[in-house]
UniProtKB/Swiss-Prot annotation:
Its cofactor is Mg(2+). This is Phenylalanine--tRNA ligase alpha subunit. It comes from Methylobacterium nodulans (strain LMG 21967 / CNCM I-2342 / ORS 2060). GO terms for molecular function: ATP binding; magnesium ion binding; phenylalanine-tRNA ligase activity; tRNA binding. It is found in: Cytoplasm.
Length: 360
């Protein structure tokens, strides 16, 4: 065996025996580095005669190429082995329980949950949902709803007015969702049965009031709609929402420009130890306002009060959420405190409350 064959066998054995990338790099430097065995042989070519160089040159260059090729092949083999080892170490057992993710840590805001509950209950009664813009015209927010000029609700201390539009139309942030009822009556033919949830705005802020709050109003327009129908709907809603089998309600005469007659509704409750319970006790708590739609409102919407009639009601979503779930202060609803939301919020898959169902 010649010296070149012996050197090649030795170097190839070292390459194949390298256990990792670091050892393989050491073999490469020892063979092909500046002072490596093969590199030193290449340096001797310059001192040889042309005949010797012609004979030895191809042999030494061939040795260099074969050693270099063996190193590349070994490096690829080691990389594949390292990848397989890493994949084995990072193997995921799909049978293990998953880690708690955002969908379990996150919470649904109580307002969102209560809106879902309200729509589920009224949806079971056959109501549709109607929506409208937060920015309304003075005509839709007041005039069409029988608010005369000079009414206190038109004053700056109650309403957020905006700069007039290009056509001079007076704009404002709606003070109730009643404009949605006007839009609905103008767009649809009776019979109409809708609820109108949404944000409303009034210039007020304390423990039970915020400048922006949520309201839901209901509207029924038909030839024979009457107060008995209104009373049944409100009773069924209160039983289903507060999850009680029965509840007493008290209708007190009141005044709203858009209804005649008008009433405020109190619900039976008990107050013990700072806790309010509905469907029992001898106390009363006001929860909403209602009444028969005023003939002037029907006329503003293009309806003939001699042919159709209807009733409407409205209640504060934030307030009934506080009552049902025992929240003492309204302001944290809008402060984005994750601790509060984690305590009072709902899991994403919690089903909207319709426990009692409807009795009729």
């Amino acid at each position: 065996m010649t010296d070149l064959q012996s050197l090649e066998s030795d170097l190839l054995a070292q390459v194949q025996g390298a256990p990792d990338e670091a050892a393989l790099e050491g073999v490469r430097v020892a063979a092909l580095g500046k002072k490596g065995a093969v590199s030193e042989l290449l340096k001797t070519l310059g001192a040889m005669s042309p005949e010797e160089r012609k004979e030895r040159g191809p042999l030494i260059n061939g040795l260099r190429d074969r050693v270099h090729g063996a190193i590349l092949a070994r490096r690829e083999t080691l990389a594949e082995a390292a990848l397989e080892a890493r994949l084995a170490a990072e193997r995921i057992d799909v049978t293990l329980p998953v880690r708690e993710g955002p969908e379990t840590r996150g919470r649904v805001h109580p307002i969102t949950q209560v809106i879902d509950e309200i729509t589920a209950i009224f949806g079971d009664m056959g109501f549709s949902i109607a929506e409208g813009p937060d920015i309304e015209t003075d005509e839709l927010n007041f005039t069409a709803l029988n608010f005369p000029e000079g009414h206190p609700a038109r004053e700056m201390h109650d309403t957020f007015f905006l700069p007039p539009g290009r056509d001079g139309t007076r704009k404002l942030l709606r003070t109730h969702t009643s404009p949605v009822q006007v839009r609905t009556m103008r767009a649809q033919e009776p019979p109409i049965r809708v609820i109108c949830p949404g944000r409303t705005y009034r210039h007020d802020s304390d423990q039970t009031h915020t400048p922006m709050f949520h309201q839901v109003e209901g509207l029924v327009i038909d030839r024979s709609a009457n107060l008995a129908h209104l009373k049944w709907i409100l009773e069924e809603f209160c039983k289903a929402f507060f999850e009680v089998e029965s509840v007493k309600m008290r209708f007190r005469p009141s005044f709203f420009p858009f209804t005649e007659p008008s009433a405020e509704v109190d619900i039976q409750c008990s107050r013990q130890g700072g806790e309010i319970r509905f469907g029992e006790g001898n106390d009363w708590l006001e929860i909403l306002g209602c009444g028969m739609v005023h003939p002037n409102v029907l006329r503003h919407c293009g309806l003939d009060p001699d042919q159709v009639q209807g009733f409407a009601w409205g209640l504060g979503i934030d307030r009934i959420a506080m009552l049902k779930y025992g929240m003492p202060d309204l302001r944290p609803f809008f402060e984005a405190d994750m601790r509060w939301l984690d305590h009072y919020g709902f899991r994403p898959l919690d089903i909207p409350s319709l426990v009692g169902g409807l009795t009729g």
